[in-house]
Regions:
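N-terminal phosphate-binding or glycine-rich loops at protein starts, especially the Walker A/P-loop
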Residues: 1-37
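Short glycine/serine/threonine-rich phosphate/pyrophosphate-binding segments
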Residues: 26-31, 80-81, 101-113, 129-134
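A structural-propensity feature for long, helix-poor, extended segments
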Residues: 52-68, 137-177
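Glycine-rich oxoanion-binding loops at beta->alpha junctions
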Residues: 52-96
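A short, small-residue-rich loop immediately preceding and capping a beta-strand
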Residues: 93-107, 121-125
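Short, acidic/small-residue loops that bind anionic groups at enzyme active sites
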Residues: 117-136
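Phosphate/diphosphate-binding glycine-rich loops and adjacent basic-rich segments that engage nucleotide
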Residues: 150-219
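Conserved small/polar residues in nucleotide/adenosyl-binding loops
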Residues: 260-265
Length: 268
């Protein structure tokens, strides 16, 4: 176990933005929420899943919808409290820990804010190691874990619970509900035991995000005998696939998501 403070949040947000490759949107608003929660409620305990008992209940917390809309609406502490209370009432069990569902954008930050507000630890694991666009696109689906019952809440206090026939239908119905709620909701899905998280989760993703963020911040201080690119690859164990120049970026926003594309004439 270790503590996550404000400087750690800065690095995690930066590294998660890299891992997300644009998925999950800009982590900026989520970073502000996480920093605000830590300032008010104290640092968050980051734990490994092996520190939990097999039957402990772990709850992912995420935002569904367009991150740019979340920037306008924000997320208050009441949403986290009501959501987790509803999960506990439904399952009749005490919630042991929070976890992120993806690495990237806002959803790398909201679990930190939730854990701080709720006084719960956060598990160093997620369901993809990146940021994919749909709810069913996680390792937990591959492992046969159900995303439902999914629970969600908007900033007005509207709450919903759905049970579906498969994880793709969670995505379909949630998007419709998200649109009706103004374009973004806070949700929890894939409520699992620690045993399931241990078997199917992508472990160490928060730590990895922090390491990448630290490498990016320190890239200007690389040794004289290395280029910034060489330093970053050496630090992270990465490698270059190709090199090119971005010539065009197109961003599109709908009520339930934001998408985009980047154009590169040809690799260099």
């Amino acid at each position: 176990m270790r503590k996550i403070g404000i400087s750690d949040i800065e690095d995690i947000a930066l590294g998660a933005a890299l891992l997300g490759a644009g998925g999950g949107g800009d982590p900026y608003i989520g970073k502000l929420l996480a920093i605000g929660a830590v300032k008010e409620c104290g640092e968050v305990s980051l734990i490994d899943v092996d520190e939990l008992s097999d039957d402990d209940v772990v709850v992912p917390v995420a935002s569904v919808g367009a991150p740019t809309i979340l920037t306008e609406k924000g997320v208050g502490s009441n949403e986290f409290t009501k959501l987790i209370d509803m999960v506990g009432s439904y399952y009749g069990k005490k919630i042991t820990a929070i976890m992120p569902i993806e690495a990237g954008g806002v959803n790398s930050m909201l679990p930190i804010a939730a854990a701080a507000r709720l006084g719960l630890p956060m598990v160093d694991v997620d369901g993809m190691g990146r940021a994919f666009p749909e709810i069913q696109m996680v390792t937990f689906t591959i492992g046969g874990v159900s995303a439902s019952p999914m629970l969600f809440i908007d900033e007005k206090g509207n709450m919903g619970l759905m049970e579906t026939i498969n994880n793709k239908w969670v995505e379909n119905i949630c998007r419709a509900g998200c649109t009706a709620c103004g374009g973004s909701v806070v949700s929890t899905e894939y409520v699992m035991t620690a045993s399931q998280v241990r078997e199917f989760g992508v472990r160490g993703i928060v730590t990895r995000s922090q390491e990448l963020g630290r490498a990016i911040r320190g890239i200007k201080n690389c040794p004289e005998n290395m280029t910034p690119e060489e330093y970053f690859f050496d630090y992270t164990g990465g490698f270059r696939l190709f090199k090119g120049k971005i010539a065009d970026v197109l961003r599109e926003k709908t009520l339930d998501r934001k998408s985009g594309s980047a154009g590169m004439p040809r690799p260099i």
